[in-house]
Amino acid sequence: MRIEVMIKGNSKEICIPLIKETTLEDIRELSEVEVYDISSGLNAYAILKNSTVCLEYSSKLYEMYIAIFLKMLDDTATSKEIMSDMGGMEPYSLLEVGLINAFIEALIWRVEQGEVVGRYEAFVEDLCRKMSSNLLCEIVSWKQEEDIMNTKFDYLLLSLRLIVMMVEYKTKEEGEIEKKSTFAFAKEYFYKAFALLGETKDLEDDMAFVFRASLTIDALVTRQVAGRISEVFPIVEDLPISKKNMFGIYIQMAEVCMSEDGALNDLLYSVFTTSCLVSLDTGYGNEFVEVLIAMVEQDGGSGGKRIGNVMETFRMIFHSLQDSESRGRERLIWNFLSFLSRIRMGRDMGDLNSIFLKFIVKYPETIELYSNFILINKIDFPLHTLHGISSFGFMKRFYSVLFNKVRKERHDKAHVDKLISEFLKFFLATKNKELIGILPLVPYIPSKREVLYVLYEIYSFLFEKEVIEHVGLFLLKTPALVGISSSIYYNVRYLRHLATRLSLVDVEPRMVVFLGIVYYCESKKLYNFNYTGILEYIQDEDGIRMSRDGLVGVIELIHSGYISRSHEFTLSYVNSLLTIALKPKTIETTLVIIEIILRRILEKEEKIIFMKGIHQRFQELFVLLSSKRFLSDEVSDSYRRLYRSIVERIKCAPNFYNYVVLCLADISFFDGEFPRGHFKSFNDLYNHTLSRMGVVEGFPDIFMVDHGWSCSENTDKAVSGPFLHRVCGSGKEEETKPRETKSHNMYDIIRTGTNDSVMSLESSTGSISLHSSAPMPSISRKAWLEMLDEGIRKREKSVSWLIDVIYTRRSQSSTIRTVLDLLKLRLRNKFEYEDLYILLKAYNILSIRENDSEEFLKHALHRGLDFKTDPAICYKLSMETNGFYRFFFRALHLAVSNLPCNEDLSFPERTQLVSRFDTADLVHIQNTFKQKMVQKLLERSRSPSYRTYFFNVDSLGVIDSLTIIRRLDDPSLVSRAFERLRESKNEMLFYVPQLVQMLRYKKVFEMAFSTLKELAKDEYVAHQLIWNLKANLYVDGRAAVNNYHGTFVRCIEEIMKEMPDGSRDIFLKEEEFISSLTKISSELTPHLRSSKDEKRRRINEYLSRIKLHPGIYIPFYPDLKIIEIVNGSARALQSHSKVPFMASFRVQDPGGQISIKQLIFKSGDDCRQDMLALQIISMFESIFKQANLDIFLYPYKVMATSSGTGIIEVIPNSKSRDQIGKENINNLLEYFEYKFGFKESEGYLTAICNFASSLAGYSLVGYFLNIKDRHNGNIMIDDQGRMIHIDFGYMLEMSPGNLNIEAPLKLTKEIEELLGGTSGKGFEIYQELMVKGFLALRRRSKDLVMMVDSFVDSELPCYRRNAVENFILRFRFELSDKNARRFVLSLIAESSQKFRTWMYDQYQKITNNIAF
């Protein structure tokens, strides 16, 4: 289908054929074309025209129209043809109107972008011809569909916008428009639009635009601007339209007025003599005034061609307002003066000033406007002439407003200087007290010499009237009165009160005033972080000469109460003082004053003395002072005393102190006393100090190099040799330079690790702060700290140097944040007391305390004793804490130091505990320290307890649970205890005897039995339970049935019943094997009197008959499988009435390793008591290990397999003391020399240490368990010299023959001789371990007491009356740690070589043939 589109071109009609109807895709493709020429442009235009009949109107289509037209208009020929066709088109359909609108909008956009609108004159004239009154009426009447009417209205508005552009262009370029008839429609539109304003609310904005556009067109074309304005202006404010549209009309009037001479003057008169501005909102009114100001100033800048004599208009307005009697007169005056106050005229200032002066006195509220007028126009005539027409009260108000504006706004400084000088002179001339309140409002005070004299006289007046306290801010702004002291000739009175206040004696009156100015002004300024005035005064030779010692005293008085509220400010101040002191020409009095100031400041600001640069500058100063030939010795000595006090105070940072002493300070300051330490030579100390300072200053960057991070070019040099030597140089560091002063909240800075004004040691030292580091890889803060800690642990054994980092770099908030975070990370990963001390020390140095410090302190509390802890660290921790923790760390120091203590540690008050600790903490404290006060607190809180020990119900141990089950009546707590047992299956093998005892209590039997069956699901636990149940069936061997016989038998049957078949078979084979072995002992009883060889033959014969099944294991070592009974290994053991024997077994561990294990089998003995004793000894051993105590115990294994039978582990590589004696060795000393070599050999000394360690362990065991029957037959010595006790048949309240003849500890003469006598080194080791072990056991007594208590109802013979109570008494809780130490030493002394020990040994010799 062929389609033809006709285009009425500029000269002829053009027919464009199209092959198809236009689609939206066609339009989209056209919009993407970059450039059009005449041919492609007309074809594209034809497609656009065709789209008006093929497509539906949409905003997207309209946008593409505009885009296409903008590109077409780039080609002049194409644009002419299109404008010709468009000019003849009548807007009928929706898309036709839309196409025309898009073209007009494209034209407007190009004009707005700078294109000359005259290029489109013909098209604009065509638009004017279409602007008929019918079009406007048709739109207003809204007779057609909404879409077409909206589009037509857009057509009208766009057309008027383009026509206005053309009229404004023609007026500007040609002055007058010739084709006036073309634009005649504007007058009709102007009146119709005016009539329609307010009637069409929905179209108000658009009709207001039509009105403004037609007004502009008509006024500019007809050249009747003034007439149109005078016609419209009076009635605009009465129109029922919005303020916005009213404002738009006023603005349009103003802009039109600029096209006609004198028109703007008429508008100005109308605006400011009518309620025009009042009718507008304040915002629109101010904006309108700004437009008028811009027009007046613009015309003024061009010589006033348009406005003419605007000043005459201002006068007319002034007279009109002055004569006005309307009620809104004040508002009109304010509007007019506000307008004048913002104009920069540059001429007629006197006339404008007269207008203001005639109004402001009557209307004081306009003072602010007058002030603005003065400032922006730089009025420079004497303002105090205002006083002639006003009162002092008015002047006070005027200057207050004026100075307030100067403070808030930027104005010409030279002009403001004049204003301030004029005021000060006015104040001095009048000396009126009403004006004193204005002095603090002065924005600043010029430092001109003539002003300084005026200031002197003003202060003289203020001091005389004693009103100096009322001018606070004036003091801050007063410049130093330098250079005028000798030329002050004013006759002033002697102000006694001022002289007394400043402690001035024999000072002439004029200098009293001068020094008063110095004191009051500089004190105020210094408090507000400004020391510049002080620096000027102390260098003012004229002032020093005239005031003599007065200035020295006043400066000292200023600094007497100095408080450092900003480290940066104080550091800058100190550096500035040292800079002056280091000037070669600085006079002696100035040096005296500087020394006084430095002493005062450095007493208060500790951070500065830890800065290397300060020490370097002091050394430079001492060199300079020594070169001053006429300087008095007293001045030099005062500086030396000052520096000595500084060096004494930096000793708390040992690395930094060493560095200062070795690398910076003059050696004469130390009088031959140098830093001490573990160093081989002075050179060793020197190199170590440099290395430490390299770490201190390079932290943290130097530890990140291993991770591939090079935070700065100096990082690798941080600890290198040449670099370290360079550190000693005298180059000034950046840290010593004066900095901008700023006060900070230290806690907030450190908490966030940020500080905009942070000072880093980025200097010749090569140390780099985090602020200066290169960007870090994108990792978390925690990961970065982990890497840092890893780097430190690889290189450093200790981080004590972090204290030096805190002292020397505390101004670098990011570094301090890193130190704190690092320490907390280390404490969480691996708790060390040293790290805790450094963290707390850092908090105290920085005067902060973060919440997590309590977390780490509580960790230390619950950690218990650790004897590997450095005692010095414990003491230091006590110094960094208070309240309970001071007591705790002091007690820890006493325990681990092994030093005599004369200090009585007092437990803290109740309030400190209640406020700081929760119940769980108090439970731990009570169980550790056994304090009556804590006990009462816990009793009031109803915390569960037994025998004054309390339970933490949220963290129950196994022995806690067992005790609660037996002793407490709280059902919920008992249930929780059983639940805890079921959760602790891995620990149950150890507690099997206690689990069995639990069955004796009827109130909990069912739950106990249920729990046992649950635990018996573990195969080996089940085996141990059955054997132990069998061991408890009878009272004594098999003589009498136990009261619980039936109960225990039932339990055995139930456990066996619930065993899987395979597990039951394994147990039966194991039991058969064990029974066959223990049976041998009972079968040998008839042969008790046979020879040893005969007994041995019979035992081996029995053993050879025993069948060994696969999977048989050592009962107390389930992992050791027995693969063979060693042939001929058995032998009978010595016993008075029984025949125990020992046999060897070849066993295999899970790894396949084969070894020999020796066991003893007994029959006729109750082994349960030995089991209990060795359980407790095992707990002793665990406590010692956890406390890092080198105390040896060997809790060998014993297991009762039934009533009266048992198996005992043989202690390998050991002999009894009795056996040693029978080998013709007279004493232990002789044996040790024979066994381990010469007394001074390493092997011998090691054996002595081992012996002392084991002797301490078993002495404590013997003391606490009250073990008796200690003779040479049950004391073993192994091949490393360690003593091991066996056979615990007599303990607690049981002794042989009920005779208690043994000493508390077995310390024979031969033991003392072996240890070198009571003063020997070995004996000292023994005593030290005894004391430490005793204290360690006291701190962990709860579990031990509960373990002893667990067998109270077992009917064991050792449990006689008060057995548990006496066990508790042996901890001596009534003694402090200090007195407990004394008690242990007295116990040792009491047992040493006692007759009771010798007597018992003799008893054993007679009764059991045990000679030694």
Swiss-Prot record:
Region spans: Pleckstrin homology (PH) domain conferring phosphoinositide binding specificity: 1056-1163
Reaction(s) this enzyme catalyzes, per UniProt: a 1,2-diacyl-sn-glycero-3-phospho-(1D-myo-inositol) + ATP = a 1,2-diacyl-sn-glycero-3-phospho-(1D-myo-inositol 4-phosphate) + ADP + H(+)
Domain PI3K/PI4K catalytic: 1127-1396
Stretches for region Catalytic loop: 1266-1274
Chain positions covered by the region annotation G-loop: 1133-1139
PROSITE patterns (alphabetical): PI3_4_KINASE_1, PI3_4_KINASE_3, PIK_HELICAL
UniProt xrefs under PANTHER family: PHOSPHATIDYLINOSITOL 4-KINASE ALPHA, PHOSPHATIDYLINOSITOL KINASE
Protein name from the UniProt record: Probable phosphatidylinositol 4-kinase STT4 homolog
Organism (species): Encephalitozoon cuniculi (strain GB-M1) (Microsporidian parasite)
Lineage: Eukaryota, Fungi, Fungi incertae sedis, Microsporidia, Unikaryonidae
Encoding gene, per UniProt annotation: STT4
